A protein has these predicted regions:
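Long, contiguous binding/interaction regions
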Residues: 1-53, 57-102
Length: 102
């Protein structure tokens, strides 16, 4: 059983219809601002998805995972709000997920 103080490395995994310049950095900044998150980095992926690695204590893992997905949605909404109606909106191609990494 994991101790409450154990550090868990999690990946927020998402794939977008297209990736606007600076979008991943915006998501990173939002996740980094979460209270329970200790580190954030974009890690390479072998497929077309983005993997945003972040660390949090075991006791905060579920809350941090939900909040990280919310940060992604907020970044999508903020970016799309700046576009005109004829410009192509950024969409998630599939459902985002948070996974524990060894």
């Amino acid at each position: 059983m994991a101790e409450r103080s154990d550090i868990w490395r999690l990946h927020l995994v998402y794939r977008l219809s297209h990736s606007p310049q600076g979008f991943d950095e915006d998501v990173s900044r939002r996740v980094r601002a979460l209270e329970s998150v200790t580190s954030v980095a974009v890690v390479p992926s072998s497929d077309a998805s983005t993997h945003l690695a972040f660390s949090t204590r075991y006791a905060h893992a579920v809350v941090a995972a939900v909040e990280a997905k919310q940060c992604l949605q907020e970044a999508l909404d903020a970016h799309n709000a700046t576009l005109w109606w004829w410009q192509r909106k950024v969409r998630r191609v599939d459902e985002s997920a948070v996974r524990k990494v060894a």
